[in-house]
Amino acid sequence: MSSILTSTVTGIDAIKILINNTADKIINSKYKDEIKHNVFVENTVDESNFNAGVKIKKIYDDYNDFLKEEKRKISERVQDEQTKIEEYLKLEDLFGEKSNIFTLLINQLYSSIENDIVNNHGNVFNENIENNLNTIIHELKNFDEKLSFLERDVKESIKEKIKQANILINKIYDTNIDIRFFPTAQLPNRIDSFIDKRDKLIDELNDIIGVKVIKENSTFKVCLNNGMCIIDDYNKKNLMTLTSDTDDKYISVGYFDDNEQRLKKIEHMIPSASLGALLTFRREDLQNAKNKIGQLTINFADSINSVHTLGYDILGNIGKQVFKISNPEIISSSQNQSYLPTSIKWVDTADAQDTNYIVFLKNNHWTVTRLRDHSVVEPDIYQQDNNTYITFDGIEFKIEGNDAEGNMYMIKPYSKTLNELELLIIKNDLFSISSSDDLNQKNRNNAIKIQHLHQEKIVNKKETLYESYLRFLKSISYKCNDLEEKVPFKRNMIEILNNKKLSESDDMYENYQNLNYEQKCYLANVKVLKMAETIFDEIVDCYS
C-alpha cells in the first residue's frame, strides 16, 4: 500500500493529459480506435506528520483548482472569440453594404465615359460624368465616416471593459481580505461561501482580461497571463484608460507603476479575453480595413489622374488632374533623439500597399517594416544636399540633415486619404481625349484608355479594384466563420467541466473512521480518476 501513498495525486496529471490531448486525438481519425488513457505518476506527498485529513483534502483541492484553471482558460478563449465574432460581423456588414462603390458606381462612371466621350464624341466633363464622380467621392467619405463610427464604438466598449475590470479587481481584493481574516476556528463551515464568491468574481475578471490564480504556501495571487500580479494579499493594481489629446480615436490600457511613479502601457499583456479581443480588433482588423479602403481609393483616383494628365484635350492642352489626393502622414516617435524637418509624398501609387510602416535608423542603417505582417522592406536610399531620401512601396520619405541613431517614424499612408479626397474638375471642363497634341491628328485613344481602367489590374499590379475589395471582404467572412465553428465546442467543454467538483464528507471522522490512511488516499485518488474518465467520455461524445 505504500506505493499508493506515493501516487495520490496521479489523477491530477491524468486529467491534464486527457483534456490537453483529447481534441487532437479525436480530430485525427488515425487515433479514433486507439485512444489511450495516459497516467503520469508524480511523487507529491509530503511525509510530514500533519493531519491525514488535510493531506487527503489536498487531493481534492488540487483537482478542483486544476479544473477551475482549465475552465477559465477555455472561457477566456470563448469570450475572446465571441467578441471578435461580434466585431467581425459589424465590419463584414459594412463592407457588404459598401461593395456597390467598386461595382455599380465605378462601372456607371466608366460607362458614362464610354458613352458620352468615346461613342458620342463628347469633349468635356458633362453633368452625367461629374455626378458619377461626385457620387463615388460621397460614398467613399461615407464609408470613412462609418469606419470612424465603428472605431469610436470599439473605443467606448474598451472603456467600459476597463471600468468593469476595475470594479471586479476591487471586489476580489476586498473579498480576499475577508477570507484572510475570517474566524475559521469559530465558524469552520462558513468560509466556503466567501471562497466561492471570490472564485465567481475571478471568473468574471478572467472573461474580461484573462487571469490565472497562484497559490503558494499561504499566499494568494491573481495575475495576468504574462505573470504580472494585479492582486495579492496586500496590494492591487487597477487598470487605467490611456487616451490621446491629439487623436480622439486612440485608446489603450495601462497602470500606474508606484515604484517608477509613471504610467505604463500594458496592452500587449492582455492579448485575449473580451478586452484583449477589442484591443486587437481595433489595432489590427480595423486598421487593416481603413488601409485597404485607402489603398483602393488611391489606386482608383491616381490611375485616372495618371492617364488623364498624359493626354490632350480638344485644344491640344495637356490634361489636368481630376482628383486631389493627400500625401501620407508622418508621426515622429516621442523618444527620438533629434527632431529634423521631414516631408513625404507619393511617387508611384501603383506600388501602394495596404499597411502602415515603421521607419527606423539602427546601426546607421534604415529599416522599413510593414506593420500589416511585420515584413521588412528594402528601401531605395540616396543622399543629396545633406538630405536623405528613403523610397519604398511608392512613397518617398525625406529627412533634412543627419538623423540620430535610434530615431523612429511611423508612416500612415491613408490617414487623410478619404477625408481630403476632392474633385478638381467642374462641369464642362475639357476632357483629355487624345493621345496626341497635334490638332490635325486628334483621336480618342486617351479617353478609351481611361474607359478601360476598370478592367485593369491596378491593385498591387495583380488585381482589379473589385477583385481586391472582394478578397478583403472574404477574408473577414472567413475569420468570422472560422471562429463561429470553434466557439460551440469550447462552450460544450465548459459545460462538461461544470459540476465536476469533488469533495469528501464534511464530517472527516465519520467519512474515514473505518479506513486506514493508505486506503483513504487510494479512494480519493480513485474518485479523481473516475471523474477524469467521465470528462474524457463526455469530450468524446461532444466531438462524435
UniProtKB/Swiss-Prot annotation:
Localisation per UniProt entry: Secreted; Bacterial flagellum
InterPro entries: FlgK, FlgK_D2-like, FlgK_helical
GO biological processes: bacterial-type flagellum assembly
MF terms (GO), sorted A to Z: structural molecule activity
Protein name, entry field: Flagellar hook-associated protein 1
Keyword Cytoplasm tagged: no
Predominant subcellular localization, coarse grouping: secreted
PANTHER family linked: FLAGELLAR HOOK PROTEIN, FLAGELLAR HOOK-ASSOCIATED PROTEIN 1
Superkingdom of origin: Bacteria
N-terminal signal peptide: none
Cellular component terms per the entry's GO annotation: bacterial-type flagellum hook; extracellular region
Natural source organism: Buchnera aphidicola subsp. Schizaphis graminum (strain Sg)
Family of the protein in this entry: Belongs to the flagella basal body rod proteins family.
Keyword set, alphabetical order: Bacterial flagellum, Secreted
